[in-house]
């Protein structure tokens, strides 16, 4: 954890957060639409 990585921590957190929100949104939308079982 020297902080000399090529990828900034904020960038990892941003991409990870967006991916998590996207997956969660798709899961909720699929369950709400009734097509969650097809996933």
UniProtKB/Swiss-Prot annotation:
**What are the transmembrane regions?**
9-29
Recorded GO cellular component terms are: chloroplast thylakoid membrane; photosystem II reaction center
Topology of the protein relative to the lipid bilayer: Single-pass membrane protein
**Which UniProt keywords are present, listed alphabetically?**
Chloroplast, Membrane, Photosynthesis, Photosystem II, Plastid, Reaction center, Thylakoid, Transmembrane, Transmembrane helix
Q: Which family does it belong to?
A: Belongs to the PsbJ family.
Q: How does it assemble?
A: PSII is composed of 1 copy each of membrane proteins PsbA, PsbB, PsbC, PsbD, PsbE, PsbF, PsbH, PsbI, PsbJ, PsbK, PsbL, PsbM, PsbT, PsbX, PsbY, PsbZ, Psb30/Ycf12, at least 3 peripheral proteins of the oxygen-evolving complex and a large number of cofactors. It forms dimeric complexes.
Question: What's the protein called, per UniProt?
Answer: Photosystem II reaction center protein J
Name its species. Answer: Porphyra purpurea
The gene for this chain is: psbJ
